[in-house]
């Protein structure tokens, strides 16, 4: 099956997608991962993305869509995939439907107080980007990444003022996309507030009969 995961910052889209991918054999495709891979491989699109990223710009819709188009053409997604971080606009959602129609858009719903608690406690590896949390996913050694031994830092956009701005911006951005999938009967809401193991269980129960 083909899924799109929607949800505000801190909803746990990437964490849930990773868990589902490991348990169900569905490929997890993240926009960030696609961009990093393109830059690392120095493809034509990768070089274009690198120039934008180096000056702190935002990669345009067309470029991101082309990268997604290329990724979902690989053989490993034949049995299904979970898209995390795409689409971010209705234009991208329409393009995705033309490329490969999805089965469900899963909207992960989490109360604001829970989102804030999650985001303010997040720590990210400055070298490889791995994510940790001071309460829920602590590294083996405080302040040091388990994977690459890089230094863990608080991202600027994980500070309180930035978090509140991000949540406001997300709502404005997400409403049209949620409406887009709702109109097509593809929208499913999932409670993302409980522990991840419970959210995974609910996901599996919800979609077991759809396979």
UniProtKB/Swiss-Prot annotation:
SUPFAM superfamilies: P-loop containing nucleoside triphosphate hydrolases (SSF52540). Residues 121-158 are annotated as: LID. GO terms for biological process: AMP salvage. CDD domains: ADK. Keywords: ATP-binding, Cytoplasm, Kinase, Metal-binding, Nucleotide biosynthesis, Nucleotide-binding, Transferase, Zinc. Residues 30-59 are annotated as: NMP. It comes from the Bacteria. Signal peptide: none annotated. ATP binds at residues 10-15, 122, 131-132, 194. It catalyses: AMP + ATP = 2 ADP. It is found in: Cytoplasm. Monomer. HAMAP family: Adenylate_kinase_Adk. Consists of three domains, a large central CORE domain and two small peripheral domains, NMPbind and LID, which undergo movements during catalysis. The LID domain closes over the site of phosphoryl transfer upon ATP binding. Assembling and dissambling the active center during each catalytic cycle provides an effective means to prevent ATP hydrolysis. Some bacteria have evolved a zinc-coordinating structure that stabilizes the LID domain. This is Adenylate kinase. It comes from Treponema pallidum (strain Nichols).
């Amino acid at each position: 099956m083909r899924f799109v995961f929607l949800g505000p910052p801190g909803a746990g889209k990437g964490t849930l997608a990773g868990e589902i991918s490991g348990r169900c054999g569905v490929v997890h495709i993240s926009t960030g991962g696609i961009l990093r891979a393109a830059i690392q491989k120095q493809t034509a699109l990768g070089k274009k993305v690198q120039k934008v990223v180096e000056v702190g710009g935002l990669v345009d819709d067309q470029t991101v869509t082309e990268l997604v188009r290329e990724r979902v053409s690989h053989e490993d997604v034949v049995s299904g995939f979970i898209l995390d971080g795409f689409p971010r606009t209705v234009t991208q959602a329409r393009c995705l439907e033309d490329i490969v129609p999805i089965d469900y858009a899963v909207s992960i719903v989490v109360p604001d107080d829970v989102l804030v608690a999650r985001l303010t406690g997040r720590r990210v590896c400055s070298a490889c980007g791995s994510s940790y949390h001071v309460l829920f996913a602590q590294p083996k050694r405080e302040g040091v990444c388990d994977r690459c031994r890089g230094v863990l830092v608080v991202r600027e956009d994980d500070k309180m003022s930035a978090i509140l701005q991000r949540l406001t911006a997300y709502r404005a951005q997400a409403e049209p996309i949620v409406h887009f999938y709702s109109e097509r009967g593809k929208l499913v809401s999932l409670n993302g507030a409980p522990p991840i193991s419970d959210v995974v269980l609910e996901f599996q129960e919800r979609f077991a009969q759809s396979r």
